[in-house]
């Protein structure tokens, strides 16, 4: 162990770790849970430190030597391999201050180490005076939240959504001529094609994609420069433009300064709204996964309209059983995301005066939702949707036996006669054509001419 000092006194720090006193204190008091600060947030914090150093140097507030040391250390961390030096939990101060200081300390100590200095000496690089210069945890952490959210939505979630939509669209085309009976209220309805049914699923994903894209609009606004309460205290003129310029350069994303810094620090309505979009996507995916599970139920004693890909045995006791496991996994993902949404809402509601104090739990749940939705949709598309096949004999069986084909006769016979015909067919356990002939409404030839399921599927 080595000894370091902070404003409260001496702290023991593991000799082989690059973090310092404040991180060690946080570990002592907040080590009782497994959830660590997401690596995406740490990367965003490191990136902010790198860009802030460049901005401070450009404005003449940080010597070239110190800037180069900070930028070099940050670059090395961003390349990977330093995860053990960022051990702090999600459950910490609600401003994320401890993780901000964790990053400050690691960058400072790595820079010191690489230049032959003594780790923990704060010489020549100081975690507060140099790495955190022109910054506060209160503006840095929400900036990191937005950066991490934007990057993960665009690199993980949106590609996975697009992949699933394309898989569904392929089935729309493949099943376009497969006429089946639709269902409303879980009961038989009029004919449609299986392709039409899948087009509804595809459109749900398409609309969710549009909602996700729109939710990014305000997420590009960054709080950096607001410092402690949004007034920009201790921020030199030009710093905000400079640091955002470098963040745009490094990420390729169109980040801009917050339209109102008091809002950017005190609330996270933008992330609450965006996670609401993720919850909406989860609702859509639950509906799709549930429908497909039912459509393939059986295979002998269920609906059996779809045949599932045979990925793995489904039972430890019943041989030959194949279950819709990808559907079930996705449904569990969606349940978790909808639960996360409540946590994000609660976190967002805790904006006390000038600072929201549940920032870590908001971004933790947000990023978890993105990760599991992206992974779940990718697997669902690859291992389930793409392998679905249609059971055409079962579709024909249901078509031939459906009583709702009577709807095609209402323009000719009227609603009342058609109702009597359908009820007779049901109670006598005969098909619709037989009931129609027995009741003397139409001849067999007239019935066949008027009741053609393929002509009842509409134009869409």
Swiss-Prot record:
Under catalytic activity, the entry for this protein gives: (S)-malate = fumarate + H2O
Q: Pathway it acts in?
A: Carbohydrate metabolism; tricarboxylic acid cycle; (S)-malate from fumarate: step 1/1
InterPro entries with a match to the protein in the record: Fum_hydII, Fumarase/histidase_N, Fumarase_C_C, Fumarate_lyase_CS, Fumarate_lyase_fam, Fumarate_lyase_N, L-Aspartase-like
Can you tell me which residues the record assigns to a coiled coil?
Answer: none
Q: Does the keyword Repressor apply?
A: no
Per the UniProt record, the source organism is Chlamydia caviae (strain ATCC VR-813 / DSM 19441 / 03DC25 / GPIC) (Chlamydophila caviae)
Instruction: Quote the Pfam families the UniProt record gives.
Output: FumaraseC_C (PF10415), Lyase_1 (PF00206)
Keyword Ribonucleoprotein attached: no
Its name, as the record gives it, is Fumarate hydratase class II
Q: What is its EC number?
A: 4.2.1.2
Classify the source by domain of life.
Bacteria
Compartment annotation: Cytoplasm
User: What's the chief localization of this chain?
Assistant: cytoplasm
Keywords tagged on the record: Cytoplasm, Lyase, Tricarboxylic acid cycle
Quaternary structure, from the entry:
Homotetramer.
Q: Quick one: which residues bind substrate?
A: 95-97, 126-129, 136-138, 184, 316, 321-323
Query: Which gene produces this protein?
Result: fumC
Could you tell me the Gene Ontology terms of the biological process aspect for this record?
A: fumarate metabolic process; malate metabolic process; tricarboxylic acid cycle
Catalytic residue list: 185, 315
Function description: Involved in the TCA cycle. Catalyzes the stereospecific interconversion of fumarate to L-malate.
Q: Taxonomy-wise, where does this protein's organism fall, top ranks first?
A: Bacteria, Pseudomonadati, Chlamydiota, Chlamydiia, Chlamydiales
Q: Which family does it belong to?
A: Belongs to the class-II fumarase/aspartase family. Fumarase subfamily.
Site-annotated residues for Important for catalytic activity: 328
Q: Which GO terms describe its molecular function?
A: fumarate hydratase activity
The note filed under miscellaneous reads:
There are 2 substrate-binding sites: the catalytic A site, and the non-catalytic B site that may play a role in the transfer of substrate or product between the active site and the solvent. Alternatively, the B site may bind allosteric effectors.
Q: Name one GO cellular component term.
A: cytoplasm
């Amino acid at each position: 162990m080595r000894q370091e000092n902070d404003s409260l006194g001496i702290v023991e720090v593991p000799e082989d770790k690059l973090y310092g006193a404040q991180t060690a204190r946080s570990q002592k008091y907040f080590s009782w849970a497994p959830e660590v600060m997401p690596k995406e947030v740490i990367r965003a914090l490191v990136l902010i430190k790198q860009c802030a150093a460049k901005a401070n140097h450009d404005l003449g507030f940080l010597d070239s030597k110190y800037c180069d040391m900070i930028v070099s250390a940050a670059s090395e961390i961003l390349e990977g391999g330093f995860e053990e030096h960022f051990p702090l939990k999600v459950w910490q101060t609600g401003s994320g201050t401890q993780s901000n200081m964790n990053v400050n300390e690691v960058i400072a100590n790595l820079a010191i180490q690489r230049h032959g200095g003594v780790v923990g000496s704060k010489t020549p690089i100081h975690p507060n005076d140099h790495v955190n210069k022109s910054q506060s945890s209160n503006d840095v952490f929400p900036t990191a939240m937005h950066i991490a959210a934007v990057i993960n939505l665009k690199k993980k979630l949106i590609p996975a959504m697009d992949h699933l939509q394309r898989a569904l669209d392929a089935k729309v085309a493949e099943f376009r001529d497969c006429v089946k009976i639709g269902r409303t209220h879980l009961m038989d309805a009029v004919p449609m094609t299986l392709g039409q049914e899948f087009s509804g699923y595809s459109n749900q994903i398409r609309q969710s994609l549009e909602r996700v894209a729109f939710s990014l609009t305000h997420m590009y606004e960054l709080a950096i420069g607001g410092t402690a309460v949004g007034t920009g205290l201790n921020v030199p003129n030009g710093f905000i433009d400079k640091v955002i310029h470098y963040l745009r350069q490094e990420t390729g994303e169109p980040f801009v300064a917050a339209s109102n810094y008091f809002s950017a620090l005190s609330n996270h309505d933008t992330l609450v709204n965006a996670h609401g979009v993720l919850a909406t996507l989860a609702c859509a995916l639950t509906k799709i996964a549930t429908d497909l599970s039912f459509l393939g139920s059986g295979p002998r004693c269920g609906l059996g309209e779809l045949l599932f890909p045979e990925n793995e045995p489904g039972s430890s006791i019943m041989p030959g059983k194949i279950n819709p496991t990808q559907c079930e996994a996705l449904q569990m993902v969606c349940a978790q995301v909808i639960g996360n949404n409540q946590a994000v809402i609660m976190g967002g509601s805790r904006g006390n005066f000038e600072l929201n104090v549940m920032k870590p739990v908001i971004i933790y749940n947000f990023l978890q939702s993105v990760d599991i939705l992206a992974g779940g949709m990718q697997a669902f598309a690859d291992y389930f949707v793409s392998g679905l096949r249609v059971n055409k004999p079962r579709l024909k069986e249901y078509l031939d036996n459906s009583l709702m084909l009577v709807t095609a006769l209402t323009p000719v016979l009227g609603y009342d006669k058609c109702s009597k015909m359908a009820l007779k067919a049901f109670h006598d356990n005969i098909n619709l054509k037989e009931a129609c002939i027995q009741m003397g409404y139409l001849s067999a030839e007239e019935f066949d001419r008027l009741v053609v399921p393929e002509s009842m599927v509409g134009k869409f």
